[in-house]
């Protein structure tokens, strides 16, 4: 297999790369020459890990295999987030094991079973009318403003309302939920340099635990009550478990859906033919293509619990493997014309919600409903939207985030190039 021609010292989790761009050419280079590639990291520059590097997994089938083999590849050992500040203490990585994303069976299996009660088609469907109404209000308010930051005025709002609605968070507390989720994920970005993500996480956990206490006293017909009350098998979430579940929702639900919405709109701005098609037909397939194109989580990692051969490459026990969803979603062997944004793409076996297996996104249906509703509302209320300036990217080696994007909702301003 040929050696990939990458610059010396190139690191696919380097947050400085993602401030400017997505390394799509480098991903394509790996897929063609070394789909499973050892990414060496110099001591002190491993984003909190001190093990010499990781295996970069770039093709869709390999990503799916790692996802499926949760008996071999652990989420618990080093957590799933592959990049922190270089000086993070090991105990600050290990504390994240309380969040379901970073668990293995049997703890993960038990929690997932309880939490899935809140994400049944019926539970998600109950939010539809409220979210439809909110989506229309959000788009109308943005249209009335004339221009502004699409991220803050449009993208942020509906995913936040979806999560808050699911949990029954009062309207007056919802902005706090948004602030905490931003602060927990922006720790590598200079905009959040003076924020302590641990403090934000602790505040959110305390808030969630109080909510659980309140619901225990005054149960209702809502997800919180369902999760903290025992089922027929006696299973329920403890207050601590519920607190960490809300942390996961605030990050995995709010942040990822928001970034899919922003980058979906950016894609429509770059592909006006697809926007015209969406406005006319509103195809159900659009949400999946938006998620594939955006791939809001660039990558997650696992750690090998034993030696394992993956597509002819020997992975050693204890080595980290990083699944680059961003690369897998543009795999030429899986997707016809992958660099074409095509809202009618069907089938669309993307891994924007994670690979198959135990950790597949539990809220995928809620995310897709939210995306469909907000784009319908944008098409109804500001069909001629145009960018004013280039988007401002989040500095992160794992989350594909957009912090700000100035747009003209009326389509009257000259377009930025």
Tell me what each language-model feature is.
Residues 1-417:
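Cytochrome P450
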């Amino acid at each position: 297999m040929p050696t990939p021609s990458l610059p010396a010292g190139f690191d696919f989790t380097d947050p400085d790369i993602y401030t400017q761009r997505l390394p799509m050419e480098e991903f394509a280079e790996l897929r063609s020459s070394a789909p499973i590639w050892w990414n060496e990291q110099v001591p002190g520059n491993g984003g909190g890990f001190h093990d010499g590097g990781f295996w970069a997994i770039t093709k869709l089938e390999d990503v799916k295999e790692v996802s499926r083999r949760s008996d071999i590849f652990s989420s618990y050992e080093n957590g799933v987030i592959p990049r922190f500040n270089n000086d993070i203490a090991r105990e600050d990585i290990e504390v994240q094991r309380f969040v379901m994303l970073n668990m293995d069976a049997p703890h993960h299996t038990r929690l997932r079973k309880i939490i899935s009660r809140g994400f049944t088609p019926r539970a998600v469907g109950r939010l539809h009318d409220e979210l439809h109404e909110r989506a229309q209000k959000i788009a109308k308010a943005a249209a009335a403003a004339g221009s502004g930051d699409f991220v803050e005025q449009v993208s942020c709002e509906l995913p936040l309302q979806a999560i808050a609605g699911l949990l029954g968070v009062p309207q007056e507390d919802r902005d706090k939920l948004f602030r905490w989720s931003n602060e927990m994920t922006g720790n590598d970005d200079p905009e959040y340099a003076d924020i302590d993500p641990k403090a934000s996480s602790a505040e959110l956990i305390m808030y969630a635990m109080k909510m659980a206490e309140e619901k225990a006293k005054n149960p209702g017909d809502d997800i919180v009550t369902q999760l903290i009350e025992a089922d027929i098998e006696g299973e329920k979430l403890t207050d601590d478990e519920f607190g960490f579940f809300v942390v996961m929702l605030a990050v995995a639900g709010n942040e990822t859906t928001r970034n899919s919405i922003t980058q979906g709109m950016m894609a429509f701005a770059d592909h006006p033919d697809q926007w015209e098609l969406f406005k006319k037909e509103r195809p159900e397939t659009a949400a999946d293509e938006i998620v594939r194109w955006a791939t809001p989580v660039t990558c997650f990692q696992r750690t090998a619990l034993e030696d394992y051969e993956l597509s002819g490459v020997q992975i050693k026990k204890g080595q980290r493997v990083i699944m680059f969803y961003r690369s897998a979603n543009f795999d030429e062997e899986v997707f016809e014309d992958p660099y074409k944004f095509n809202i009618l793409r069907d089938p669309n076996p993307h891994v924007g919600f994670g690979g198959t297996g135990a950790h597949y996104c539990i809220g995928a249906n809620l995310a897709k409903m939210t995306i469909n509703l907000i784009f319908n509302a944008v098409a109804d209320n500001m069909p001629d939207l145009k960018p004013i300036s280039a988007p401002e990217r989040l500095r992160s080696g794992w989350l594909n985030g957009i912090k700000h994007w100035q747009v003209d909702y009326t389509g009257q301003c000259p377009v930025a190039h």
